[in-house]
Amino acid sequence: MYRISTEIHSAATRIGEEKAVELYAKAGFDAYDLSMFSMCGYDWAKGRFYESDHPFAKSNYLAFVRNLRRIGEECGIHCNQSHAPFPVCCKEIRSYLKRAIECTAEAGGQICIVHPDNNKSPEENAEFYFELLPFAKAHGVKIAAENMWNWDSKAGCSSFAACATSESFLAHLNAVKDENLVACLDIGHAEMRGSGEGAPHMIRALGSRLQALHIHDNDKLHDSHQIPFSMEIDFGAVAAALKEADYRGYLTLEADSNLNDYAEEEIFSGMVRLKESAARIALLMEQA
């Protein structure tokens, strides 16, 4: 039986993390991804960091996370993984990464996704992960690198970035050679023309080192983060590859654009649709 999970940031920005956890449990999810993008801010146009007033950024951040865990336990849902803030090329954001790992442990999560620096080599990113791994191990949390992408405005498509290909991803993992650094494959990124080389191929190449997922759909050009089965990705092929690779982790959605289509009073309906899409992938894996 495959367990299903989802990011909570897209709902939390509208109804708060507490209500998001409660409603995702009601919708039928087994778990949630503690998405910590609100821990700090980044102006992508200006390339500048800015501070946040979110509870993740305040002195009582652990109490806030502890309360989320309590709500989840009461509702029958748990945290399986988390996502640290990014981009890590920003030194101010890097200063929050240990806090993100600490929050992951407090929430009960097993894995914290920490992006590599898009434009650094495997060896350079290894040094970055080496700085975090002792802290993560002390808190009982694994770190997962993720396949990234850049954008080529001239070509009108994505372009290579750290971990974008199987070769690059494996080079990053091999540069660290620590079982506590694992792979989170972003299915949508892997399918983007110009940078990725196809999710099924990357799933098979990563094998047992693949321990987390970000699942969403796109048109194979843009990073759309839409609900599975709504655009162009072949989730039958993805499910077959996951089954072949003996993937044992959670099926975690990152379809964070989907709820934009729902008014606040209809958000729960959107959550149910997300759950149904994740359950459909789980069924495809069982049938593969």
Q: What is each residue range found by the language model?
A:
Residues 58-74, 131-138, 201-205, 237-241:
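Catalytic-core regions built around general acid/base machinery
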Residues 52-58, 83-90, 115-119, 227:
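The substrate-binding groove and active-site-proximal loops of carbohydrate-active enzymes
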Residues 66, 70-78, 87-185, 191-192, ...:
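Active-site acidic/histidine proton-transfer and metal-coordination neighborhood
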Residues 1-40, 73, 98-102, 108, ...:
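Histidine-acidic metal/acid-base catalytic patches
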Residues 33-67:
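Glycine-rich, proline-tolerant flexible connector loops at the mouths of alpha/beta enzymes
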Residues 39-40, 86-88, 118-120, 151, ...:
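Positions that flank functional sites
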Residues 44-46, 155-158, 226-227, 264-265:
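Short aromatic-enriched loop/helix-cap "lid" or pocket-rim segments at secondary-structure transitions
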Residues 30-37, 78-83, 112-113:
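Short, well-structured secondary-structure segments
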